UniProtKB/Swiss-Prot annotation:
Its cofactor is Fe(2+). It comes from Phocaeicola vulgatus (strain ATCC 8482 / DSM 1447 / JCM 5826 / CCUG 4940 / NBRC 14291 / NCTC 11154). The keyword Repressor does not apply. This is tRNA N6-adenosine threonylcarbamoyltransferase. InterPro entries: ATPase_NBD, Gcp-like_dom, KAE1/TsaD, Peptidase_M22_CS, TsaD. The lineage of its organism: Bacteria, Pseudomonadati, Bacteroidota, Bacteroidia, Bacteroidales. Belongs to the KAE1 / TsaD family.
Amino acid sequence: MDTIILGIESSCDDTSAAVIKNGVLLSNVVSSQAVHEAYGGVVPELASRAHQQNIVPVVHEALKRAGVTKEQLSAVAFTRGPGLMGSLLVGVSFAKGFARSLNIPMIDVNHLQAHVLAHFIKESEEDNNQPKFPFLCLLVSGGNSQIILVKAYNDMEVLGQTIDDAAGEAIDKCSKVMGLGYPGGPIIDKLARQGNPKAFTFSKPHIPDYNYSFSGLKTSFLYSLRDWLKEDPDFIEHHKNDLAASLEATIVDILMDKLRKAAKNLKINEVAVAGGVSANNGLRNSFREHAGKYGWNIYIPKFSFTTDNAAMIAITGYYKYLDNDFCTIDKPAYSRVTI
């Protein structure tokens, strides 16, 4: 009998639904909210309202593209957290009600674990390029920077994480200081491709173990920029490519230094990257360089699976379904949680 999972994602500002059948992706629909760009960041109230407007048509479209009726579903998987509480509640409430109406199991999914398991999304039966357990995963996004030891689908251990700002958050804030707009990741990435990564030097933290810190880098960037602008009011315009490239290179160096140490100490050569920042060109290139230099088997997600999406929720739900790992209707959403 086929196992068909509907995944629902609504943790931040993307409303998404996806359908996976026996581990193979049939559809993945994402509705993004452009309204937040004018505010320089996600406005929780606006995000919640947009989710309410989008969730029904998005789910309908996901089922339609998959060629699946709701009666064929085996279970409904949904993001339970972490994320914005108002946004989460829309997806959680809809998923619970939908599953209850169909009398099928509901599966709660940790959003961070789902980013890691995005590497197991198969777009065809022949797609077998997945990491082998155990492997290391660098999870980098606007809210998280973690090194994770992945022992099995549902067995993960955080080896290190940021003690303050996440890498993506630092990029967004530096982009905002430069007047480049939001979200900063794609903008910095585009400019960095035309710049010199060694043009400017910014401070790197000395944090023990495998933990990260990006608040000092953010402050160093801000103060350096302030001093340069005193000498040349048009400094940003004259040097934005080099600034972006130097910022990106510094962040990538910080991320890869700890990941490299973890891989060496644990003697693991299966290494993956996940999360929104994994779309960054500089980080992807660094992974490829490390693969050649250190013999890593690397796993870099498709761009469509780097940002928030329901395909990763559905595949996580699929493996939880195989373990009979279901949740009850009284399980609440949670805004803060780790793996």
